[in-house]
């Protein structure tokens, strides 16, 4: 799946052309980054590349030797053994790249976005729905 996401999103180094590592969203990493950096808002980019997928996964926890961690394990040995625990979402068929408002987005897309906000304890203020500079949906005035 990582290779597919990388190709869909054109995730290659601008200078070196080296392929970037890609995978499903890990909300534990996002939540931790938001907490330690004092973030109040999130920007979700490249949401459009998920269009057409039947199912979309999101890492919500880790399994370490049968124990569930709802946060990034602080012990490096546990971190190396951690296996992702995923929540799975129904995808959407619609091409969202021309949509201009949150209300236009498919319901399954909105469900996915609401879950990100819920698990990260941080609101989403902007969504990128296409490759062009004007393919953004603003949800809060802060980033306009």
Report the location of each language-model feature:
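Non-transmembrane, aqueous-exposed alpha-helical and coiled segments at domain scale
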Residues: 1-144
């Amino acid at each position: 799946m990582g290779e597919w996401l990388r190709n869909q999103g054109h995730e290659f180094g601008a200078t070196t052309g080296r392929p970037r590592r890609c995978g499903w969203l890990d909300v534990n990493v996002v939540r931790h980054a938001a907490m330690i950096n004092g973030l109040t808002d999130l920007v979700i980019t490249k949401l459009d590349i998920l269009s057409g997928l039947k199912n979309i996964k999101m890492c919500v926890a880790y399994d370490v030797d049968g124990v569930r961690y709802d946060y990034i394990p602080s012990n490096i040995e546990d971190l190396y053994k951690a296996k992702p625990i995923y929540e799975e979402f129904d995808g959407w068929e619609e091409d969202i790249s021309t949509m201009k408002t949150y209300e236009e987005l498919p319901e399954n897309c909105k469900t996915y976005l609401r879950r990100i906000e819920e698990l990260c304890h941080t609101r989403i203020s902007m969504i990128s729905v296409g490759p062009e500079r004007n393919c953004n949906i603003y949800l809060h005035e802060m980033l306009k």
